[in-house]
UniProtKB/Swiss-Prot annotation:
Family matches, as Gene3D superfamilies: Cobalt-precorrin-4 Transmethylase, Domain 1, Methyltransferase, Cobalt-precorrin-4 Transmethylase, Domain 2
Keywords on record: Cobalamin biosynthesis, Methyltransferase, S-adenosyl-L-methionine, Transferase
Stored InterPro entries: 4pyrrol_Mease, 4pyrrol_Methylase_sf, 4pyrrole_Mease_sub1, 4pyrrole_Mease_sub2, CbiE, Cobalamin_biosynth_MTase
Alphabetized CDD domains for the sequence: Precorrin-6Y-MT (cd11644)
The protein's annotated pathway: Cofactor biosynthesis; adenosylcobalamin biosynthesis; cob(II)yrinate a,c-diamide from sirohydrochlorin (anaerobic route): step 8/10
EC number of this enzyme: 2.1.1.289
SUPFAM superfamilies referenced in this protein's UniProt entry, alphabetically: Tetrapyrrole methylase (SSF53790)
Protein name according to UniProt: Cobalt-precorrin-7 C(5)-methyltransferase
Disulfide linkage: none
Domain of life: Bacteria
GO function terms (MF aspect): cobalt-precorrin-7 C15-methyltransferase activity; protein methyltransferase activity
GO biological process: cobalamin biosynthetic process; methylation
Length: 201
């Protein structure tokens, strides 16, 4: 059985008991280097996931008789690896154990409700700045290519510099920082972040 577990934004201290139990019973464990390092005592086979998703799919396919757990950042189905694995193997063959997404964690820390929030991501994908500008409350996971500064620049160009950006940096880590800034004032680089954009009207 293939199981995909959400690790939350920073590691095992935010994982569910079900996720930790799945890892305890796994024959093989796959994930990014940072994720695998959270489980130094795991004695089974390991696969370090890089940019080549095809290599992961082949590795899993060759071990279908084993209990495989794939470690996913945040929540596996919020712009995560779980989506790709379900599409490839089918939901009948994949068990998803949810995790806390970076967006959920940031909203909890900042006291921002998610009831009317538009969710998206610029992590490894293109984002529509027109859609960002047209929604009153947006939350997204970002990356180095399209981070808070790049998003702010595009919003200012669309007349949205008055809006508020909440930037969660290194979430759930010892060096976590949460910044509240007008979009027009965002002009720095931030590490491993999620962003909420609010319309102050």
């Amino acid at each position: 059985m293939l199981t995909v577990v959400g690790m939350g934004p920073a590691g095992r201290h935010l994982m569910t008991p079900a996720a930790l139990e799945a890892i305890d019973h796994a024959d093989a464990l796959a994930g990014g280097k940072r994720h695998l390092a959270q489980f130094p005592a795991f004695g089974g086979e390991r696969f370090t996931l890089g940019a080549d998703i095809g290599a992961l799919l082949s590795w899993i396919a060759a071990r279908r008789d084993k209990g495989i757990v794939v470690l996913a950042s945040g929540d596996p189905l919020f712009y995560g690896i779980g989506t790709r694995l379900v599409a490839h193997f089918g939901i009948e063959q994949v068990r998803i154990i949810p995790g806390i997404s970076a967006v959920q964690y940031l909203c909890a820390q900042a006291g921002i409700d998610m009831n009317d929030m538009w969710l998206t991501s610029s992590h490894g994908r293109c984002v529509s700045f027109e859609q960002l500008a047209n929604h009153r409350k947006v939350a997204m996971v970002t990356d180095a290519r399209c981070g808070p500064r790049e998003i702010a620049r595009e919003l200012v160009a669309r007349g949205k510099g008055h809006r508020l950006m909440v930037i969660g940096e290194n979430l759930a880590m010892e060096n976590e920082r949460i910044h509240w800034l007008p979009v027009s004032a965002v002009n720095a680089d931030y590490e491993m972040n999620a962003v909420v954009i609010l319309d102050e009207r």
